[in-house]
Amino acid sequence: MGQIEWAMWANEQALASGLILITGGIVATAGRFTQWYFGAYSIAAGVLICLLEYPRGKRKKGSTMERCGQKYLTSVVKLFGPLTRNYYVRAALHFLLSVPAGFLLATILGTVCLAIASVIYLLAAIRGEQWTPIEPKPKERPQVGGTIKQPPTNPPPRPPAEVRKKPSEGEEEAASAGGPQVNPMPVTDEVV
């Protein structure tokens, strides 16, 4: 049985919690809650989390499905180097971002989800995982000369290979020289 790659689960959990934080922050800010500034903070924190978590990391084994438009954000995330690559840093960052949003009812669900993502990232870091970007594969163009095969010498319909008889040397020479061929079956022109 294969090892579980915890970072993949943490990435999905953190991205969902960022979206939940944005939604809760919009509700708190638009609804003019008494502590609406926590709602505004949740919107900003949710956007930051979504930008950080949108690019998926490359899996150790198998293939990784790249998100739509991920290559643009991947280059931005790569700029921060070890701050975004190290899962200990991500676990601490997500936990610290989740604390202020916990003081408002509209954002408490996003807070809990982000805290869970932080714990999963911590587990991934303990197991030695780290974020590596998905690099685009160079497209290999087939070489023109390597793909062309010899055309068949026998016109269709062709009998199966085991039924075909091997041409003798004399027939091969006649065929290659372009000379007349002798029909082995007698042909009669009688109409019955």
From Swiss-Prot:
Top-level taxonomic group: Eukaryota
GO biological process, one term: superoxide anion generation
Tissue: The strongest level of expression is found in kidney, peritoneal neutrophils and peritoneal macrophages, and a lower level in spleen and small intestine. Very low level of expression can be noted in brain, liver, testis, and heart.
Subcellular location: Cell membrane
GO cellular component, one term: apical plasma membrane
UniProt-annotated stretches for the region Disordered: 134-192
Cytoplasmic side: 2-7, 54-69, 81-86, 127-192
Membrane topology, record value: Multi-pass membrane protein
Residue(s) of cross-link: Glycyl lysine isopeptide (Lys-Gly) (interchain with G-Cter in ubiquitin): K149
Segments on the Extracellular side according to the record's topology features: 31-35, 105
Intramembrane segments as residue ranges: 70-80
Record's function text: Subunit of NADPH oxidase complexes that is required for the NADPH oxidase activity that generates, in various cell types, superoxide from molecular oxygen utilizing NADPH as an electron donor. Subunit of the phagocyte NADPH oxidase complex that mediates the transfer of electrons from cytosolic NADPH to O2 to produce the superoxide anion (O2(-)). In the activated complex, electrons are first transferred from NADPH to flavin adenine dinucleotide (FAD) and subsequently transferred via two heme molecules to molecular oxygen, producing superoxide through an outer-sphere reaction.
Protein's name in the database: Cytochrome b-245 light chain
Organism: Mus musculus (Mouse)
